[in-house]
UniProtKB/Swiss-Prot annotation:
Specifically inhibits C-type lysozymes. Keywords: Cell outer membrane, Disulfide bond, Lipoprotein, Membrane, Palmitate, Signal. It comes from Yersinia enterocolitica serotype O:8 / biotype 1B (strain NCTC 13174 / 8081). A lipid is attached at C22 (N-palmitoyl cysteine). Transmembrane segments: none annotated. This is Membrane-bound lysozyme inhibitor of C-type lysozyme. It comes from the Bacteria.
């Protein structure tokens, strides 16, 4: 009986270690394309470091992720990019400067018409 218990404990530990290894997979980076009225916005999302990069006002911005009640929010306290589902907006100094952004399936595709996938 003692030998059976020892084998079970070893197998159980091995199973836990294998499952723990599965959670170490790093999320991939993504390039997201938005249509914001007549303006296109491209956002590079670095999931490993929880930040996004985008070009606004002729400047390359890198915004770290910050706490949000809902959606994903990135801010450097001057610029803010906030997305939820397939929609997003951009603020500068707490004023919305780009609104009504809809995620595109690819840069050349039509807008996802209000669908949350």
């Amino acid at each position: 009986m003692k030998h059976l218990f020892g084998t079970t404990a070893v197998l159980g530990t091995a199973a836990v270690l294998m499952l723990t290894g599965c959670s170490l997979v790093q999320p991939k980076n993504e390039t997201l394309h938005y249509q914001c009225g007549g303006t296109k916005l491209t956002v590079m999302q670095d999931n490993k470091q929880d930040k996004v990069s985008l070009v606004l006002d002729g400047k390359q911005l890198t915004l770290p992720q910050v706490r949000a009640a809902s959606g994903a929010k990135y801010s450097d306290n001057h610029y803010t990019f906030w997305s939820k589902g397939n929609t997003a907006f951009v603020e500068r100094d707490e004023k919305v400067i780009i609104n009504d952004c809809r995620l595109l399936t690819t840069p050349n595709d039509s807008i996802l018409q209000g669908e949350d996938r």
